[in-house]
Structure formats: C-alpha cells, structure tokens
Amino acid sequence: MLHLYNSLTRKKEPFVSLKPGTIGMYVCGITVYDHCHLGHARSMVAFDVMVRYLRSQGFDVTYVRNITDIDDKIIARASERGVSIDELTAQYIDAMNNDTHALNILPPDHEPRATGHIETIIRLIQRLLEKGNAYVSENGDVCYEVDTFPEYGKLSHKDIEGLVSGSRVEIVKEKRSPLDFVLWKKAKPGEPSWPSPWGEGRPGWHIECSAMAMHELGEQFDIHGGGLDLQFPHHENEIAQSEAATGKPFANYWLHVGMLQVNGEKMAKSIGNFYTIADVLKEHHPEVIRYFLLSSHYRSPLNYSEENLLNAKKALIRLYQAVKDVPPQTEDSKLDEYWQVQFNQAMNDDFNTPVALSVLFQLAHEVNKSNSPALAHTLKNLAGILGFLQKDPESFLQSGLAEEEKLVIEQLIAERLQARAERNWAKADQIRADLLSKGIELEDGATGTTWRRIAE
C-alpha cells in the first residue's frame, strides 16, 4: 500500500483518496518572470514521477500545475525590459515548455493561469469578506485576517509569534496584524488591473492558487504539492483562506520537495547562485539531469555539482549498456513480477526513488548475466516510470560527443581496420586500448566495428 509523508501531520500515512481510484493533485508552478532553474526542475521532475507512478498503479490522476502570470516581480521585470507583461510572460512560458519537454516532464492535465481566473478569485474573496475572514484596509487593499482562523500555523507547525519573528512578513500599517496578507491589491498607476467590487486592482499571490485549485479540483482534493520554500507563508495562507471559505479540509496530503543546494545554500534567483535548465542542458544530456534529480529522495536536500552529474551520467551508461544487446521482446512477454514488486515497494514508501534506482541496478545486473529479453523489457518499463531509459541505446551511448570527436573515433576505427587487414595486430590493439582509456569501447561484429561510451 502507498504511504506518503504528510507535511501537515509530519508523519507517513497510508494514502486513501477521497474517491476510490481517482486522485486530484495540485502543484504550485512557476512565476514566469525569468528562466527556470534546476530547483524548479527538481520539483517538476519529482511530481512528474509521482504522477507517472500513480497512473502505473491504475489511479485516474487529474494533475494541475498552475502558472503565476501576474506578480510584483513580473511587473518590475517587464518595466526593466521595456516590454509588455504579456510579451514577458509569453517568452518565459515558451522557455519553460522547452525545458520541460527536454527533461521528458509530462504536461499537466490542466495548467491554469492566474489572469484567466480573475472572476473565480473575486468570488472567493467575496466569500471571505462575507464570513468575516477578510477586510478592506484603509489603502483599498483587501486583506485576510489571520486571527480569524484559529488553526493558522498548523502546516508549518510554528506558533504565531514564531511565524511573525521568523518569516518574511511584510509590515504594513494598514494591516490589522503583521501576518495578515493581501487578497486583492488596489491598482497603482501604470500597473495592470481588473475591475472588482473594491475598485480596480489585481489578485494577491496566495488567493490565486486557492481559487485555481478549487476551480479545477473542487473544494477538497487529495494532494497539494510544491517546493519546501512554499510551505510558509504560501501554503499556510492557502489553507487558511480556503478552509475559512469552505469550512472543509482543503487538501488531505501536503507534499514538499527539498531544496536544491549549491555549496550548502538553497539555489535561488534571489541569491544569484542558480543554474538555468537551459544552460545545464547545453552541457549535459537531459536524461542525465533527470537521473541526477531523482538520485536523492524528493524530501531531502540535493547538492548540485559537476561530480554528481558525472555520477548520474555513469549510472545511466551502465543501464543503457545492460539493454543494448538484448534480443527484441516478443509481443506476449510479460513483465517480471518479482522485480515489479521490488520496484513498487520502494515507490510505495513515499516515492523512494533512490531505493527504486537500486532495484533497477540489481535488475540490470541480472540482465547482463542472462541476456533475457523479458528482464530487459521489465528494466525499460520500470525505468520508464521514472522517465528515462527510453532512448535508443546506441544513440544515448554516443551522445554528448561533438561531431569532431565522433569523426576522430571513426577515423581511428578505419585505421585499426586497415592495421588488421595488414595483420599489424600490435597497432590494432594499441588503437583499441587508446580509445578504451578515453571511455570508448569497440565491438567487432559480422557487419563491422561499432563503438560506444562506457562508464569510466
């Protein structure tokens, strides 16, 4: 049975969906004012694998990942660039789609944008005003009054005083309490705005997600996810406003992905230590990046380094080598039940991908020993749930080399062929040894000599 670590209760719990066989999942997406960095990729890959696995187990999953396309940062960046907000957000949405496609991240079933749900947001704010959980401040903003929700802090597990002193709470004199947060911002000159019962303005960040999640999944759903940095204040505020409005639990399970770190610090645009997905893709194969992001449990911190990416590359080469020369699978062959069970046990333990990967390597070892099509097929199928090992092995094993390098290898193979024709075995063996020392293995067959990279 699937067990998930629920941030709300701080323990692993058996997963029971609201409606048997179906799952509603909402994950906070990106704010589109810049290129996605690897921290974003980690979260997106983690939830992508969760969705893939849940579907492989027969669940009908509705996966929602939003786009924040109106925000202070977006407005500021558009102003800096001298472009419209629509131009800016379109540019970075396209860039995000390119990144996710390269990393084999499946598109969500629904990808709502904040600007497309203004009326839904306004209606939710009206409910909160009617129930006495919100107020119109002196400056015209509509704010949520945290003191009206006694359970505030139940997700981050901090007391109210701790939240005030230990968080990035904006102190605004118009608020009744420092923890109160804006639901609707009164329009400022030159900023985008929409009409509302409280005048021209735009929605606050937190209310956008509550409104979009409930619009797509209903007032209650199964799983809400995002990066650990969103737990407070964003997710805490989502719970407060949503549950105050409906009187029901918002999401049953809260899942948070640990931070991607560089030298022990969170990778973040605000710190300036981030690596964009696009830049890393220039240096590393997409599957290598994906493997690296899954090499640590999703809740644990993960350190970015070239060494860790190199280790991911070597690991993938070993897996591709295992399936490279296996005879084709017959149509009536089934997956090996033993290895399926081992893999599922790992994934049922809160999506434990490091253990699942170890199962794949044990299986690859058996494939190497037996050359069994059934085991190789099982290996590819299980790895496919993690989103890799689906490329042509030859293509992957020769990837990452510049065309000039490939030409040099082919030239050396031709020289070796000539040396063998001349019975110059010493030269032929030396060429093979030189290439092997550079991680290139030659294979002589009936149709000629082929080459591939190997894990050094």
From Swiss-Prot:
One annotated GO biological process: cysteinyl-tRNA aminoacylation
Cofactor: binding comment: Binds 1 zinc ion per subunit.
Annotated residues for binding of ATP: K269
Motif 'HIGH' region, residue numbers: 30-40
Subcellular location(s) per record: Cytoplasm
EC code(s) of this entry: 6.1.1.16
Cellular component per GO, a single term: cytosol
Regions annotated as coiled coil: none
InterPro entries (alphabetical): Cys-tRNA-ligase (IPR015803), Cys-tRNA-synt_Ia_DALR (IPR015273), Cys-tRNA/MSH_ligase (IPR024909), CysS_C (IPR056411), Rossmann-like_a/b/a_fold (IPR014729), tRNA-synt_1_cat_dom (IPR032678), tRNAsynth_Ia_anticodon-bd (IPR009080)
Binding site for Zn(2+): C28, C209, H234, E238
HAMAP family from the UniProt entry: Cys_tRNA_synth
Similarity section: Belongs to the class-I aminoacyl-tRNA synthetase family.
Protein name: Cysteine--tRNA ligase
Phylogenetic placement of the source organism: Bacteria, Pseudomonadati, Pseudomonadota, Gammaproteobacteria, Legionellales
